[in-house]
Amino acid sequence: MERDFMPPVIATESHLMSVKSDSPLIAKTRVVLSGSVDAANAVAAYYAEHDCDVTNDDNGAKISLSVGHLILRPGEKHLDIEVGSKSEAGVAQMKAALIAILQSIVPEADLDCRWKGAGESNGKLPNFRELRVIGVTDLSSHMRRLRLAGDDLEFYDGDGIHMRLLIPPRGVVEPQWPTLAPNGMVIWPEGENAVAPRVYTIRRIDATAGWIEVDFVMHGDNGPGSAFALNAQPGDRIGMTGPLGGELPDADWFLFAGDETALPAIGRYLEE
């Protein structure tokens, strides 16, 4: 299913919490800014508005997310920050989200910071996977399924059924993928190399065999996802990040309703 891109600010990636050891990985940094108390309060309020658990004390705030925790400690003209998660991908996600939030709501902050501890930047997104097309199946006149092969897909074989496909420009043989800046922020390719991020559902996955299947609603060239699926040939490359959650809560029964873009998720829920 093709949707508008949703920035990875507050993603409920509960799958990240279940695939690594119980010992959290910790990373710390210091951001230089005046008004650090106001900045910490603004960040904490942002997370609270997105239904995260926020605990305030005399020293700052602790924020609990499905992917880990975030601690804010304001000082004199600086804000000390700690992020903790059970995976390198979780640490990277929280760094990128926090820097993006600070950039948005505290524009005066000096974000030329460096992290110490887990996940020190090597420029790579730990949850990024490059995939290639190995199969094309038309399910109907308006739905096409692509089988995409890649390495290390066990990370995606969990409760989180959604992910983000990074669709390269048409005709680009060697796509440029996003990287991580030293401050943890995601650097996206720009101009003629810009990729189009879109959220999709992993319809099926066989991590051992090394493939996933994704269903695309076909509407010609109107949209990067549909255009990619329409022109897909074996060997074509596409990127993936995530997973993005989508697991069902505990309940006695469910009522599913949606348009054709929701069919892949509904189908997977019914099968599983």
Question: Where are the model-predicted features located?
Answer:
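Ferredoxin-reductase
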Residues: 136-227
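A common structural junction motif
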Residues: 48-53, 99-107, 167-168
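Short Lys/Arg-enriched alpha/beta "domain-start" segment
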Residues: 2-55
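Short, structured interface segments
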Residues: 93-122, 236-240
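Short, intrinsically disordered low-complexity segments
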Residues: 53-88
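Short, conserved charged micro-motifs
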Residues: 36-42, 88-95, 153-158
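Short coil-to-beta-strand transition motifs
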Residues: 121-130, 190-198
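FNR/FR-type flavoprotein reductase catalytic core
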Residues: 224-272
